[in-house]
Amino acid sequence: MMTTKPTFAVTLVTLFPEMAQAITGFGVTRRAVDNGQLQVETVNPRDFTEDRHRTVDDRPFGGGPGMVMKVEPLAKALQAARVANPAAKVIYLSPQGQPLTQAKATALAEQPGLILLAGRYEGVDERLLDAEVDEQISIGDYVLSGGELPALVLIDAVSRLIPGVLGHQDSAEQDSFSGEFENLLDCPHYTRPEVYGEQAVPPVLLSGNHELIRRWRLKQALGRTWQQRPDLLEARRARGLSKEEQQLLDEYIAEQPSHTAKTTD
């Protein structure tokens, strides 16, 4: 059933509005748009230029390579975005921003809406950031051609946390980094057939014992994180492992062939 007002509105300020179709045209986010739970609009800064070339960039003061996006068209584009999304926080996608984490996505999902500014070229005039942007967010320590892909990643991560978007609320809570799995990688998942080649589904998952399954999944999540992302495990330790979690992690490590070379201390 369509709602009369979207529960979450996102306005993407971009030179390439067609890229938003990756969100509005496919999968979970498309269903959220179709169901009125998510609204994604675009604003193109070129529509706010005053020359016949629709210029949005210029050479940097002080010299150097590349071009810098101009203040005026971006400021006008953001002002137009605020008309449609007045309570939204303005976020600039940038390698200089704070890392996008599950905790950050959860916090953003509680906002009334978002205005996302996707830069291009060498970046945007710093005066625009000082005057118009509330926060900068990065999706990783690497450089992309523009901010559109990071913006789409952010929209997808936040959309999953909007109530009702996923078919089952536990789907979001059992993702990596969420709920019981905060600061942990996800556990392994299996579906039919029960046997593929010489590989069988772990018997515990066929047992029907929900408590044993829960403990197995938590144990696997702890173990995977210990093996693949020890930095995340340290973050989990910082908030305190429960007695059960420490026991399950110790069991997992003891089961590994090379466990004597590693320690949980």
Swiss-Prot record:
- Decide whether keyword Transport is in the record: no
The record's annotation in InterPro entries points to: Alpha/beta_knot_MTases, tRNA_m1G_MeTrfase_C_sf, tRNA_m1G_MeTrfase_TrmD, tRNA_m1G_MTases_N, tRNA_MeTrfase_TRMD/TRM10
EC main group: transferase
List the Gene Ontology MF annotations in alphabetical order.
tRNA (guanine(37)-N1)-methyltransferase activity
Which coarse location class describes where this protein primarily resides?
cytoplasm
Q: Which SUPFAM superfamilies match?
A: alpha/beta knot (SSF75217)
What is said about its interaction partners and assembly? Homodimer.
Question: Record's family?
Answer: Belongs to the RNA methyltransferase TrmD family.
- From the Swiss-Prot or TrEMBL record, state where the protein is found: Cytoplasm
Q: Which reaction does it catalyse?
A: guanosine(37) in tRNA + S-adenosyl-L-methionine = N(1)-methylguanosine(37) in tRNA + S-adenosyl-L-homocysteine + H(+)
User: Can you name this protein?
Assistant: tRNA (guanine-N(1)-)-methyltransferase
According to its UniProt entry, this protein's organism is: Alcanivorax borkumensis (strain ATCC 700651 / DSM 11573 / NCIMB 13689 / SK2)
Where does the signal peptide begin and end? none
Cite the binding residues for S-adenosyl-L-methionine. 119, 139-144
- List the keywords (alphabetical): Cytoplasm, Methyltransferase, S-adenosyl-L-methionine, Transferase, tRNA processing
Query: What this chain does, per the record?
Result: Specifically methylates guanosine-37 in various tRNAs.
Has the keyword Methyltransferase been applied to this entry? yes
Q: Name the EC number(s).
A: 2.1.1.228
